[in-house]
A protein has these predicted regions:
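Conserved ATP-binding module of the ATP-grasp superfamily
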Residues: 145-149, 169-172, 181-217, 239-250, ...
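ATP-dependent carboxylate/phosphate-activation module, predominantly the ATP-grasp catalytic core
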Residues: 190, 209-275, 279, 286, ...
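ATP-binding N-terminal substructure of ATP-dependent carboxylate-amine bond-forming enzymes
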Residues: 8-124, 339, 401-415
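Short acidic-hydrophobic, aromatic-tinged amphipathic segments that line or gate anion-handling sites
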Residues: 68-75, 150-154, 184-187
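Peripheral (often C-terminal) accessory segments that flank ATP-dependent C-N-forming ligase machineries
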Residues: 6-8, 14, 329-416
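A conserved helix-loop-beta module that forms one wall/lid of the active-site cleft
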Residues: 112-182
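Glycine-rich phosphate-binding loop signature in dinucleotide/nucleotide-binding domains
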Residues: 87-94, 165-166, 200-202
């Protein structure tokens, strides 16, 4: 346990009650200390809990916290519970508990329930945002188009009947989970049989009709009334599963503008799920062809909800695209219930990465030289993210989709 308390200028915080905010894992992902910094600048006492040694925190991470409590493992609920109890004893009532991290959402909800923290999701609501099978009920409730689905636990005969309706291929994926991990594309009967024969926990899977199109996300910060304080759209590659399995190069971008149809569906989804006080990342397909029962080419179809910010450097990319600070907008929502952060000029922010196993037509130095004026980030990716995101990333701010496409082509072009 380490104490890094600082003295506040109370003149900066006279317009809201002094609050105690426990941030779980403020050091990882490694950009998340910025949420803590903005909270602290808004006069909030930021109390960090993680399992990293205090001396391994960066100076920025330390400065963003009022106090830090190290546990042996964040996986040990009893230890984390005792850490929260320690803060409650020393600082008084805990107002918020949050990680903004998919991995810890259930633990966050458990802690809120045990400590009667009412500013976020609790145990009785967690299944609706973690289980894909539960998500479908809320999409239907909100009248939001979404892919048809069946639980694999219903058995192979039930899936055969399902396939007669929707056709091959289908996608089988864990009911609880994110990304491509544990996901199967099933294209014929033999693969369906192999899935049931080889996947020991198939009872914990769902199967969905396969939809093709761009994946577009509605990224928003939602206030206590369930209304957006900020909205943005990111366009993702159609299959992270293929990128991981086939070792493809990755690119994606934050869009300059959001179609009104996505904005309307995003807001309806927020209301259907009863979301409040959160940064959300809601995924939709943009159909690349007409699809009976779902919509026409260009329409949006719900994929899944994520009650946390988009992964990787996407929050920073949103900042560059929208000339704003989403870390600050989120902290404003917590401290003031409104955004006190300006937005400026809008543009595209594009990400493209490379893998060390390939030889590229243009050198690292050529990429830096060509995009010197537009480059906003350039670094090696952490090993944890390299399977999906490659080893070397470049992120630029651009004015048109033509420029985005040219940038991706230049970075990804292979040597002949």
């Amino acid at each position: 346990m380490q104490d890094c308390r600082t003295v506040y200028n109370f003149a900066d915080v006279i317009d809201h009650e002094f609050m105690n905010f426990i941030f779980i894992s403020p050091h990882f992902p490694h950009t998340y200390w910025q949420f803590c910094r903005r909270l602290k600048q808004n006069g909030v006492q930021v109390l960090g809990i993680a399992d990293a040694p205090y001396d391994e925190l960066t100076g920025e991470q330390k400065d963003s916290l009022t106090e830090y409590y190290r546990v042996g493992s964040l996986e040990n609920y009893d230890e984390v519970y005792r850490a929260v109890a320690y803060f409650a004893f020393h600082y008084g009532r805990i107002d918020w508990i949050e990680s903004n991290n998919e991995y810890w959402l259930e633990q966050d909800a458990h802690l809120r329930t045990d400590f009667n923290v009412t500013t976020g999701i609790r145990n009785d609501q967690i299944s609706s945002i973690k289980e894909k099978s539960e998500m479908k009920k809320y999409y239907i409730k909100g009248g939001i188009p979404t892919a048809r689905q069946i639980r694999a636990a219903e058995g192979i005969d039930a899936l055969r009947n399902f396939i007669r309706k929707v056709g091959y291929p289908i996608i089988a994926k864990p009911d609880v989970g994110v990304g491509a991990s544990g996901t199967f594309k099933i294209e014929e009967d033999s693969q369906l049989e192999a899935f049931f024969d080889t996947v020991d926990d198939y009872q914990n899977y769902v199967a969905e009709e396969f939809i093709t199109g761009e994946i577009c996300s509605y990224d928003a910060i939602i206030n206590a009334e369930g209304d957006p304080l900020f909205e943005s759209m990111t366009v993702w590659p159609p299959s992270i599963m293929d990128i991981v399995n086939l070792k493809l190069d990755l690119s994606y971008y934050v869009a300059k503008e959001m179609p009104e149809s996505l904005r309307e569906l995003g807001r309806r989804t927020v209301k259907a799920f009863g979301v409040w006080n959160r940064f959300v990342h809601l995924e939709f397909f943009r159909l690349d062809s007409d699809r009976e029962g779902l919509g026409q080419k260009g329409d949006f179809v719900a994929l899944e909800v994520n009650m946390r910010p988009a992964g990787g450097y996407t929050p920073d990319m949103i900042n560059y695209a929208q000339s704003t600070d989403v870390y600050k907008i989120w902290a404003d929502m917590v401290a003031f219930g409104e955004s006190r952060t300006q937005q400026g000029a809008q543009q595209y922010c594009a990400f493209a990465s490379r893998r060390d196993i390939y030889q590229y037509a243009h050198s690292h130095e050529e990429v830096l030289s060509r995009y010197a004026d537009q480059m906003v980030m350039c670094e090696r990716m952490p090993e944890l993210f390299s399977a999906a995101m490659g080893q070397q990333m470049y992120t630029v701010r651009l004015q048109s989709m033509e420029e985005v496409n040219d940038f991706v082509e230049f970075v990804h072009e292979k040597r002949q």
